[in-house]
Amino acid sequence: MKTLIARHKAGEHIGICSVCSAHPLVIEAALAFDRNSTRKVLIEATSNQVNQFGGYTGMTPADFREFVFTIADKVGFARERIILGGDHLGPNCWQQENADAAMEKSVELVKAYVRAGFSKIHLDASMSCAGDPIPLAPETVAERAAVLCFAAESVATDCQREQLSYVIGTEVPVPGGEASAIQSVHITHVEDAANTLRTHQKAFIARGLTEALTRVIAIVVQPGVEFDHSNIIHYQPQEAQALAQWIENTRMVYEAHSTDYQTRTAYWELVRDHFAILKVGPALTFALREAIFALAQIEQELIAPENRSGCLAVIEEVMLDEPQYWKKYYRTGFNDSLLDIRYSLSDRIRYYWPHSRIKNSVETMMVNLEGVDTPLGMISQYLPKQFERIQSGELSAIPHQLIMDKIYDVLRAYRYGCAE
């Protein structure tokens, strides 16, 4: 990460896409997409997804590292080209506890990530805990971030410190996505970004972390990009020029969250304006979802009724029976909630792919389709971009490859924006 940031600060148009997903097919696609390039791939886990207690994936940081490395070995992607990152590392998961208890767990969280070899650490102590004022004072946020940084430094080896990098700041939506419709978004003021940097510098120095400050590579701000269930707020470069100019006088770049669904031109403009780390998550699993839904429609037409997976019906039934991952995000009417379950850009389906019933139904569908020849006309109907690539010889009509290529479409846009 440090080399990439140095190249960007030296004037190169270079950025990196941060893949924020624990889905094995998304990780496989991210690694396979860059297998034949010289680029490194940044894969991040969030604190609620992966933590010392397992998170909602059931994985500790060490488990997640091995999970990613196993996929890399299968794909033929060199492990040393993978950068592992931890996102929103702080009290996010324990906000209902008092600050002392939440920070104690947060310290162990950060240590677990660093011990597992994660080298990009987002120190995010912005969340109010039980008994805290809302919002927290910037000084309190910075002081808690310094506590987390001290924890990271205390377990990092000398070799790890050479690679270790920190991201500070948190002008981002609640991890997991927006819970309501959005009409506009607040772009970070330069004064607020400067204050974030100033308070963190002061807090780090007070804790004897002057050297660690040299490892702070980025600050999270809001450049004016966001999405909800059916709306996308697109990047308007002219609105972020003050931010773009301010960061040029520092050693850092910006990290932009929720960049999903922007245009490839927007990604290029974001990187040009020094938002050099572009986070993406739901757009990748949304592309996966589109591919699986398309293949399910093809299965419906090609496979005898008694042998079909019933994949779409299984997904719907499981999500209606177990609504904990979407209930507070989606609309309440039955028809509206069904539309959101299927097609929301927030893509809450991503939390359900590991469910045994859904996983088994998708596997059945894949086996069914691997045993038949899919007419090109059907691929054109349901996966038109992939049809064009089949016609040009770039792609084969194998179900797994069709899913991969659908995810590649998202990665292609980021590659354009981050291109060296």
From Swiss-Prot:
UniProt xrefs under Pfam families:
GatZ_KbaZ-like (PF08013)
> What's the protein here called?
D-tagatose-1,6-bisphosphate aldolase subunit GatZ
Nucleus as UniProt keyword = no
Q: How does it assemble?
A: Forms a complex with GatY.
SUPFAM superfamilies named in the record:
Aldolase (SSF51569)
The entry's family comment says: Belongs to the GatZ/KbaZ family. GatZ subfamily.
Q: In which pathway does it act?
A: Carbohydrate metabolism; D-tagatose 6-phosphate degradation; D-glyceraldehyde 3-phosphate and glycerone phosphate from D-tagatose 6-phosphate: step 2/2
Q: Which GO annotations describe the biological process of this protein?
A: D-tagatose 6-phosphate catabolic process; galactitol metabolic process; phosphoenolpyruvate-dependent sugar phosphotransferase system
Please provide, in alphabetical order, the Gene Ontology terms of the cellular component aspect for this entry: plasma membrane
Q: Which UniProt keywords apply?
A: Galactitol metabolism
Q: Briefly state the protein's biological role.
A: Component of the tagatose-1,6-bisphosphate aldolase GatYZ that is required for full activity and stability of the Y subunit. Could have a chaperone-like function for the proper and stable folding of GatY. When expressed alone, GatZ does not show any aldolase activity. Is involved in the catabolism of galactitol.
